[in-house]
Amino acid sequence: MKKTIRQTIVSAVLASTLLLGGQAMAANFNYQDNPFTLVYANAITKNEAGKVNIHPVKYRVNGITIAANVYTPANFDPNKKYPALTVAHPNGGVKEQVAGLYAQKLAEQDFITIAADAAYQGASGGEPRQTDKPFNRINDIHGMVDFLESFKGVDTNNIGALGICGGGGYTFAAAQSDKRIKAVATVSLFNTGLVRRNGLGDSQISTIQERLQQAAEARTKEAQGNVEYSANADLTKITQADIDKMPTGLYRYGFEYYGKTHYHSNSTPRYTISSLLDLMTFDATDHADLINQPLLMIAGSNADTKYMTDQAMQKATGTADKKEVIIEGASHIETYRKPEYVSQISEALTQFFKAKL
């Protein structure tokens, strides 16, 4: 049974690993061609007077060094006050991908924005690498707020939060307690704890106890210096036929995004198996009623993750100022990159944050 469950876990995670692809895959956006290693359309290539500028920064959260990019609006004057936004990246993603895209888009609308790599991930510090625990991800968002409060030019009474995919779930959770966040928005929310526990679309409920046992065993090994990860496949050997067999659009489109079109060397879906001890007992919506801030939730009509946005919106009973925007025709990953959908989402986010901050 243990072997069967382990194979089930590896197969499921391999699918999610495939959506980040391997280093051998050619990228439409080559992170090495951009001085800030940004991999999205119309990304900043240099700081120029009178335009949106990017500022790589480092700071500490709970003793761990966090790497982040701050975007300042065109003609930024640090002696003036600007509304500001935190932007939390997807699971396995990094600040240079879709989080950077929306951070730049919103900076173009006169917001100061910050996109940070999660602790233990990307260019941020922390060991073991790829530890992926809700407490850390939520504190990453609190830490971004901390940083913004000390950044000259930020109107500390007008800080909002945006999260994408897994970062959306963690932003939704962070806003439940952090009332410094005055407005909350999510794009393609992914409730990581729910999916790690039940599987995407409740496809792994029958193996919950066995996977918890595996996580406990991994914790023991980790304490002895042997870190176990969710997948260790040689992605250079994955074929197109393997990709075509992927069961969901999330994985197929994700492979194209992370593995081909927007590949970044710091991005990986791998996480420590011991992290499941925390992930599988977490749900981003458990205290959704504590959100009393204005709330905007955006999802694609064709996203196989849309049900998570629907559930979170339904549970957010503590705010009367809430709106769900459905992007017709969009899948989960298409909200990261397809120009017409990115434009619609950027417009909705701009209108929301300008009205609420």
Say what each PLM segment does.
Residues N79-P90:
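Short beta-strand element of the alpha/beta-hydrolase
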Residues G92-Q104, A118, T309:
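The serine-hydrolase catalytic nucleophile loop
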Residues K105-G125:
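Conserved alpha/beta-hydrolase
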Residues T131-K152:
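Alpha/beta-hydrolase active-site loop
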Residues F172-E256:
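Alpha/beta-hydrolase-fold enzymes
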Residues A330-V342:
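Catalytic histidine-centered segment of alpha/beta-hydrolase-like enzymes
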